[in-house]
Curated annotation (Swiss-Prot):
Name of the gene: glgB
EC nos: 2.4.1.18
Name the UniProt record assigns to this protein: 1,4-alpha-glucan branching enzyme GlgB
Cited NCBIfam families: branching_enzym, PRK05402.1, PRK12313.1
SMART domains (alphabetical): Aamy
InterPro entries assigned to the protein according to its UniProt record, in alphabetical order: A-amylase/branching_C, Branching_enzy, GlgB, GlgB_N_E_set_prok, Glyco_hydro_13_cat_dom, Glyco_hydro_13_N, Glyco_hydro_b, Glycoside_hydrolase_SF
Broadest EC class assigned to this enzyme: transferase
Assigned keywords, A-Z: Carbohydrate metabolism, Glycogen biosynthesis, Glycogen metabolism, Glycosyltransferase, Transferase
Gene source species: Butyrivibrio fibrisolvens
Record function comment: Catalyzes the formation of the alpha-1,6-glucosidic linkages in glycogen by scission of a 1,4-alpha-linked oligosaccharide from growing alpha-1,4-glucan chains and the subsequent attachment of the oligosaccharide to the alpha-1,6 position.
Length: 639
């Protein structure tokens, strides 16, 4: 039975303060009942409107049928309309102070019309029955910094197309659920990061120009279908991260821009309210109601849809007032510099509320500069994020791996530099969609050499990534050697898995993921030197790297030896920290992975003798583009 929904004076007060964190239960369109009649309660923030009406298919889009009432503060307009059913299309018809009539989609709508339509649609989120309690039980008491996190970044509409021949070829959320769960479990990813979920009008924006912040896109079904997808992922032990875009919004006239005839979501000064590079509007974070809109939105996805994390897009564009702008296109802050004080306060507020309420929620910053303390807590003057994408590592990795092996010795430092600042933040190593578009080539096509060399290069490169400190992220298709760049218009080239090299690559990444999750040395201590030690970081003449990851309990330490050239290194000697047997757990040169074969023994006994400043060493023939991974135990000493 529907309950009566209404806006109280307390609601208005808290919203005006920017602290009404469940305002999404009041603003928007909600099933309600008044005087025994069922219908929908509509509410919209439009403080400068002269008048507001609700128009929809239930009243023939009649401009005069349903006039809303202004609240006591004058900022919010409300109306209960009996008889409105679930699934009805509607908009707010706002009359501006100058007489203009603006047809606006509901900023707080939970569901929207499928593009090219842009109306909002009524729905009821309360009907879905969740069954993911075991997932939440499994998270209790866990420090996510000390857990394995391996993220599969995915765009639903282009992951796989339906063979039914329809124009879009989209699988529904429910159809996608069954397929993606099977894939993620097979590969052993811990999380999926979904891009393009919040409603957006243009497919080519990939979901980064949003019009419906509270509406899962209708491209793949209804909101309850999206709930089903998350529920299924949780039931199989897979976390869900959502791409979230608080930096800017779509300028389309039916959306948030100039919403009530004035700029209530953006700053009216284009130097503050517009992003020239992207052609988008910038949220005015000085306004409490705008901050409330965004922070409540984050909580909405967590509470209503059981989202486990938010990857926050374009953080740098928010922190710097002059980001992507020329002189004269931006306004300094009150101190005369380029720091966006409102954005800094917003991130501290956002993370304090979200992570203070839900400690295991992953808030992840895509921050591309050296802004300090992104993952430090707000009480230490940090922004409070759980993790930050390590864009510096990503850049150096891609630039190095693209080089002809002959020139790699001159860029040897590019693969070691990231460890020099690794302890400054809690990092995720991202190889995301941004690296495989706009003529940047897919990951495998970035690699030098003939086809077999490209795959060998990528195998050793990925091994370096999984051995390096930091959580992991791979974009879809890059785990099996997708050769074309990503396009939102087509599915991944799954047919490539008919080829030995691609099957080998998929199996190899699957093995990397298995090893990563199995051995705590690879994830327990990611952000200080206690978990990582170079054996030899300076062998630039041969372009080899050796290091080991140290387990906190002294057991199952992992040694990595990498050869970044096509030259076999006969009798390769590497220093090791302890006596004992080193057991091989991964060999990139194996034929089953697409390699040419390897003679590296499964077990190698350490020999006493100084090497690489270590008291012991092991010796073997290091294959061309070889990645050799060993597990070993700390030798116990008697007291």
């Amino acid at each position: 039975m529907s309950q009566k929904v209404f806006i109280s004076e307390d609601d208005e007060y808290l919203f005006g303060q920017g602290t009404h964190y469940d305002i999404y239960d009041k603003l928007g369109a909600h099933p309600s009942e008044e005087k025994g009649k069922k219908g929908f309660f509509f509410a919209v923030w439009a403080p400068n409107a002269a008048d507001v009406h609700v128009v929809g298919d239930f009243n023939g889009w009649d401009e005069n049928a349903h006039q809303m009432k202004r609240s006591k503060t004058g900022n919010i307009w409300t109306l209960f309309i009996p008889g409105v059913a679930i699934g009805a299309l509607y908009k707010f018809l706002i009359t501006a102070q100058d007489g203009r009539k603006l047809y606006k989609a509901d900023p707080y709508a939970n569901y929207a019309e499928l593009r090219p339509g842009n109306a909002s649609r009524t729905t009821d989120l309360s009907g879905f029955k969740w069954s993911d309690s075991k997932w939440y039980e499994s998270l209790k008491g866990k420090d996510m910094n000390r857990q394995p996190i391996a993220i599969y970044e995915c765009h639903i509409g282009s992951w796989m197309k339906h063979p039914d021949g329809t124009e879009d070829g989209f699988y529904t959320y429910r159809q996608f659920a069954d397929r993606i769960v099977e894939y993620l479990k097979e590969m052993k990813y811990t999380h999926i990061e979904l891009i393009g979920i919040a409603e957006h009008p243009f497919d080519g924006s990939w979901g980064y120009q949003v019009t419906g912040y509270y509406a899962p896109t209708a491209r793949y079904g209804e909101p309850t279908d999206f709930m089903y997808l998350i529920n299924q992922l949780h039931k199989h032990g897979i976390g869900v991260i959502l791409d979230w875009v608080p930096a800017h919004f779509c300028p389309d006239e039916f959306g948030l821009a100039c919403f009530d005839g004035t700029c209530i979501y953006e700053d009216p000064d284009p130097r503050k309210g517009e992003h020239p590079d992207w052609g988008t509007k910038i949220f005015n974070l000085a306004k409490p109601e705008v901050k409330n809109f965004l922070i409540a939105n984050a909580l909405y996805w967590i509470r209503k849809f059981h989202i486990d994390g938010l990857r926050v897009d374009a953080v740098a564009s928010m922190l710097y007032l002059d980001y992507g702008k020329k002189d004269g296109q931006w306004v300094p802050n009150k101190y005369g510099d380029n720091k966006n004080l409102d954005a800094i306060e917003f991130f501290k507020h956002f993370n304090s509320v979200v992570r203070g309420t839900y400690p295991n929620i992953l808030t992840i910053a895509e921050e591309s500069t050296a802004w300090p303390k992104v993952t430090a807590p707000p009480e230490e003057d940090g922004l409070g994020f759980a993790f930050k994408w390590n864009m510096g590592w990503m850049h150096d990795f891609c630039e190095y791996m693209k080089l002809d092996p002959y020139f790699r010795q001159g860029a040897h430092y590019m693969m070691t530099f990231a460890m020099s600042y690794n302890d400054s933040e809690n990092y995720i190593l991202p190889l995301s969609h941004d690296e495989v578009v706009h003529l940047k080539c897919s990951m495998v096509e970035k690699m030098p050499g003939y086809k077999v060399d490209k795959y060998a290069n990528l195998r050793v490169g990925y091994t370096y990534m999984f051995g390096h400190s930091g959580k992991k992220l791979l974009f879809m298709g890059q785990d099996f050697g997708q050769e074309r760049e990503w396009s939102e218009k087509r599915e991944l080239d799954w047919f490539l898995l008919e080829n030995d090299l691609n099957r080998g690559m998929k199996d190899y990444v699957g093995k990397l993921l298995e090893i990563y999750r199995k051995y705590p040395a690879l994830y327990e201590v990611d952000n200080d030197w206690g978990g990582f030690e170079w054996i030899n970081a300076d062998d630039k003449e041969r372009s080899t790297y050796s290091f080991y990851r140290r387990a906190s309990n002294g057991k199952d330490n992992i040694l990595f030896v990498l050869n970044m050239t096509p030259m076999e290194r006969k009798g390769f000697k590497v220093g090791v920290p302890f006596d004992g047997t080193y057991t091989k757990i991964l060999d990139s040169a194996k034929e089953c992975y697409g390699g040419s074969g390897s003679s590296v023994p499964d077990k190698i006994k350490a020999v006493k003798g100084l090497c690489d400043y270590k008291d012991y060493s092991i010796e073997f023939d290091l294959p061309p583009y070889g990645a050799e991974v060993f597990v070993f135990q700390t030798k116990k000493t008697k007291n």
